[in-house]
């Protein structure tokens, strides 16, 4: 009986730990999307275009502002593993995106597809 109780307790605690890791990874994805939304808002607020350069197998997104600033943005605990149809994303001064596409983001052992919609610059994710 004691062995059964110990096994049950261990399985419940590991379930909670794996759930916690998944929720933490989704939080990282939401933080990335929030940062991308910030770049869109900055483009609108400063009346300029902002271009994001996406590279396969990279944890860095390069940012180029129309007014000349260039800098890198680091993806926390993740990296881009695949880029589909979109190597650059440009938010114009109205906040729309120049083209649609997606990239695969790996956060620890979980994969997420980050999807850019051309209409109104919408960004969303789907767990793979």
Residues of each region from the PLM?
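N-terminal single-pass transmembrane signal-anchor helix
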Residues: 1-15
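N-terminal helix-rich module
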Residues: 10, 16-34, 41, 45, ...
